């Protein structure tokens, strides 16, 4: 087993620690301080840093962490500009192997050109591509790229656990409800996540099979989602990619 430890950072970021005995990997350490505190509290040795993309709230802690753990390896996307450190830059289909854990690299452009996700052992570390009940903004890529990236992630097994990088779930669900007000899965999820957040608990990880029921960005082929997008756009939409494009621009101003 590879327990995953949640490290909250900033206002709504999550940094993930993947643990094996007294060793660990860290995913998207935007801030070193909470990571160092957790490593010290648990007496863990940092073996490697995994980055999904180049935004500062995901890479800002790299220099300090490497200062404390100079032998830790650094991995990140080959097609994104990475921190000025020696690292192994990864592309689609590459693998990381660590204490029996094999993580496959999946190129998921959209949020950034080079954004990657790490998948293995039933876990998906997807940065700012797929969120619970939502998806990332398009800072560099196109709607077509993001839609294709989400479709690729949606093809993973139902029991895949999604470890994304932000606590956006409730706001995403409110948008989903605006799109599909008659979707009972969305209504039930709002109740569940509201209770978790009131207790100060994270809404993550989320199960991919459940996401297909309430994440409207994974439901662009559904008539109910298409109808709502057409009503918002005041035009007919020919395919799921067009529906996604409308949903993403709608969410940007929701």
Curated annotation (Swiss-Prot):
Gene Ontology terms: biological process: methylglyoxal catabolic process to D-lactate via S-lactoyl-glutathione
Domain of life the protein comes from: Bacteria
Pathway: Secondary metabolite metabolism; methylglyoxal degradation; (R)-lactate from methylglyoxal: step 2/2
InterPro entries: Clx_II_MBL (IPR035680), Glyoxalase_II_hydrolase (IPR050110), HAGH_C (IPR032282), Hydroxyacylglutathione_Hdrlase (IPR017782), Metallo-B-lactamas (IPR001279), RibonucZ/Hydroxyglut_hydro (IPR036866)
Main enzyme class: hydrolase
UniProt GO molecular function: hydroxyacylglutathione hydrolase activity; metal ion binding
Catalyzed reactions: an S-(2-hydroxyacyl)glutathione + H2O = a 2-hydroxy carboxylate + glutathione + H(+)
SMART domains recorded: Lactamase_B (SM00849)
Positions contributing to Zn(2+) 1 binding: 53, 55, 111, 128
Keyword Nuclease found: no
Gene3D superfamilies: Ribonuclease Z/Hydroxyacylglutathione hydrolase-like
NCBIfam families cross-referenced by the UniProt entry: GSH_gloB (TIGR03413)
Function: Thiolesterase that catalyzes the hydrolysis of S-D-lactoyl-glutathione to form glutathione and D-lactic acid.
Similarity comment: family membership: Belongs to the metallo-beta-lactamase superfamily. Glyoxalase II family.
Protein's name according to its UniProt entry: Hydroxyacylglutathione hydrolase
Originating species: Aeromonas hydrophila subsp. hydrophila (strain ATCC 7966 / DSM 30187 / BCRC 13018 / CCUG 14551 / JCM 1027 / KCTC 2358 / NCIMB 9240 / NCTC 8049)
Lineage per the UniProt record: Bacteria, Pseudomonadati, Pseudomonadota, Gammaproteobacteria, Aeromonadales
């Amino acid at each position: 087993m590879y327990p995953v430890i949640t490290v909250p950072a900033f206002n709504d970021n999550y940094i993930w620690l993947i643990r094996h005995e007294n060793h660990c990997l860290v995913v998207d350490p935007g801030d070193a301080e909470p990571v160092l505190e957790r490593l010290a509290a648990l007496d863990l040795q940092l073996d490697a840093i995994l980055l999904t993309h180049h935004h500062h709230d995901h890479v800002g802690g790299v220099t300090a962490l490497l200062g404390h753990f100079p032998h830790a390896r650094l991995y990140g996307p080959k097609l994104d500009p990475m921190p000025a450190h020696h690292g192994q830059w990864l592309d689609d289909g590459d693998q990381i192997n660590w204490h029996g854990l094999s993580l496959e690299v999946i190129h998921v452009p959209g949020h950034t050109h080079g954004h990657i996700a790490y998948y293995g052992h039933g876990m998906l570390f997807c940065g700012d591509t797929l969120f619970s009940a939502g998806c990332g903004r398009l800072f560099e890529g196109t709607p077509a790229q993001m839609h294709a990236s989400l479709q690729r992630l949606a093809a993973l097994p139902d029991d895949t656990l999604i470890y994304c990088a932000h606590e956006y779930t409730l706001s995403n669900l409110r948008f989903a409800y605006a799109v599909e007000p008659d979707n009972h899965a969305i209504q039930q999820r709002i109740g569940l996540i509201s209770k978790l957040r009131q207790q100060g608990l994270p809404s993550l990880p989320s199960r991919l099979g459940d996401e297909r029921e309430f994440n409207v960005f994974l439901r662009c082929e559904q008539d109910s989602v298409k109808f709502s997008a057409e009503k918002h756009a005041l035009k007919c939409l020919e395919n799921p990619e067009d529906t996604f494009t409308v949903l993403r621009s709608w969410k940007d101003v929701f």
